[in-house]
């Protein structure tokens, strides 16, 4: 798990690429992109989160191979587990049935640019599931024991 600005996440991944110990341990990855808006009302804080779940892939895969090898076998199971545990979190105040978000399957992501025309942000060949605008409410003063 990583969190931060997308460029910071890429810098961390680049450092891992240079490390013999972590070069092949970068993926699968769940990353929370910051900054995000927080709306505060009383003791409740509501945030709209942008998250990516990604794994490395082969640059010569066709879409059907990507779905079979990376999405069905790796990314979808991670997505399902992530959402299951996110909904069960005692810190989430949104009812599980009321969570709203946009899910995007990103085939061959990382070579055409992540946000607009900034160019490539991820330096690896990856397939990903992007979760946009995951709206959830949290207690303002929740503490982890």
Question: What do the predicted segments below correspond to?
Answer:
Residues 12, 18-22, 63-66, 114-123:
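Low-complexity, polar-biased intrinsically disordered regions enriched in Pro/Ser/Thr/Gly
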Residues 1-42, 93-100:
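Small/polar-rich, solvent-exposed N-terminal microdomains that initiate assembly or binding
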Residues 66-83:
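Short secondary-structure subsegments characteristic of cysteine-rich extracellular domains
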Residues 40-44, 93-145:
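Short, charged interaction patches at domain edges and termini
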Residues 46-66:
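Short acidic, glycine/tyrosine-flanked loop/strand segments centered on an H-E-D-like triad
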Residues 34, 53, 138-140:
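Hydrophobic side chains in beta-strands
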Residues 28-31, 49, 134:
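A broad, low-specificity signal marking well-ordered, structured residues that form hydrophobic/aromatic
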